[in-house]
């Protein structure tokens, strides 16, 4: 198994992100797996699984923005903010598509959002969902988020409305669904959620667990083209090619002075085109941030 790669998975409904990792550990023959961006069990879609040395890339992604397709159900409010929870309020739906489309623009832009009780956000070291399961409510502080785009997609069923949302890391679509309901004057909850983009990864690059498990069992996963190189996640950064002397400095953690490049972060390659890792240039000094390539 490639010990430094990324496997984009189309997470199935009913699975936690941890469930996916647990299943893949056996199939891939390694325990060193990680993921970027937890998905709720009911949600489907993009879950990037980082393998081996690539796990160090998960928290270094330059792009953390997400895109979702979310179905909002009007007339129902639950304790979890989605249809898996216990109903807290029901009401007749007196609004429709026109009213929903009219309120969507007010949710665009930078704003503060209160994290839901059923979330992994920690207060005093304890995840909020643990307190929620005990019936407790913890005081929370709103957090800054950004919603870049909201597009109305249609109504798959009476009372259900689907939107596409492009947003920043840390945005809770369950909270957005409830807030849209509040703006409409009716209770609302999340009926379905599918993540179609997470940073550098798109749903078109993802494969289902049955597909991945079958390829792993057949011994064809390495040749499938489904395993992406770790530099895929850094594609938005400028590239820098270094000679053997600078390469040696990088591997040894030594800075290179008088380096001619603009200040900033770079993905670094050697003369043979092998991806080495990340480095920063500051006032003419090139300093390694992280090496992903194993020294030959």
Q: Would you name each region that the model predicts?
A:
Residues 1-9, 18-35, 39, 43, ...:
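Accessory RNA 3′-end/elbow-binding domains used by RNA modification enzymes
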Residues 1-169, 173-207:
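Catalytic cores of RNA-modifying enzymes
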């Amino acid at each position: 198994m490639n010990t430094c790669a990324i496997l984009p998975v189309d997470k199935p409904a009913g699975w936690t992100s941890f469930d996916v990792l647990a299943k893949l550990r056996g199939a891939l023959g390694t325990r060193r797996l990680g993921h970027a961006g937890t998905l709720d069990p009911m949600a489907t879609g993009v879950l990037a699984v980082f393998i081996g040395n690539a796990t160090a890339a998960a928290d270094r992604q330059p792009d953390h923005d997400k895109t979702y397709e979310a179905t909002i159900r009007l007339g129902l409010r639950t304790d979890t903010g989605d249809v898996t929870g216990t109903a807290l309020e029901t009401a007749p739906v007196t609004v429709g598509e026109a009213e929903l489309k009219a309120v969507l623009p007010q949710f665009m832009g930078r704003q503060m959002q209160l994290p839901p009780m059923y979330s992994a956000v920690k207060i005093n070291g304890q995840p909020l969902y643990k307190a929620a399961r005990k019936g407790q409510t913890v005081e929370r502080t709103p957090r800054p988020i950004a919603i870049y785009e909201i597009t109305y997609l249609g109504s798959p069923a009476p009372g259900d409305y689907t939107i596409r949302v492009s947003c920043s890391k840390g945005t809770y679509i369950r909270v957005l669904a409830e807030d849209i309901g509040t703006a409409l004057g009716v209770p609302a909850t999340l009926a379905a959620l599918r993540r179609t983009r997470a940073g550098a990864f798109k749903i078109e690059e993802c494969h289902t667990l049955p597909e991945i498990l079958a390829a792993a069992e057949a011994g064809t996963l390495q040749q499938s083209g489904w395993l992406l190189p770790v530099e895929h996640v850094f594609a938005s950064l400028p590239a820098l090619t270094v000679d053997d002397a600078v390469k040696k400095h990088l591997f040894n953690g030594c800075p290179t002075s008088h380096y001619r490049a603009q200040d900033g972060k770079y993905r670094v390659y050697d003369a043979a085109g092998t991806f080495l890792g990340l480095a920063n240039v500051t006032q003419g000094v090139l300093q390694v941030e992280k090496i992903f390539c194993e020294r030959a």
